Amino acid sequence: HPLKSVLEAINAGVYIFGENRVQEAQEKFQKLKLDNTKIELHLTGPLQSNKVKPAIQLFDVFHTLDREKIAREFSKYRKLLVNKKIFLQVNTGKEKTKSGIFPEDTKDFLFFLRQEMKLPILGLMCIPPIDDDPVYHFNKLKLLANENKIDELSIGMSDAYEKALQF
């Protein structure tokens, strides 16, 4: 959304925003976040390794940690991750066109993230396949979360938010 829309939202009392791209978020939110500490910015799109440091400096929540290379980049900037939240992206549909680890790799990858990389993993995230019932994938993610002692889920696109609220 354009900056004008963001400013209107802030004036209406909205302080939580999501962005798909680091560069677009920098253009809109770099100054806004300095002026308004209530703003919480979520990265919902894929992250390239060369954008990790600027992303950590700007965003508060990361929904798409999905591979070892990015985890290693995050780990380099651990000191900047205080009060940041990270979700591990799980490809519950095992789609070749989507990012995320496969469900059966979740436990081992979480161990790597937490023990070796020392990253604060808050939750799990999934984007269900477009032609599948999202509830099946939300259930699968919830089970993985329970098995791995994780409390938070990032689930549901706009068209499935009502179903996501059940979890």
Predicted regions and their residues:
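Conserved alpha/beta-domain cores
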Residues: H1-D151, M157-D159, F167
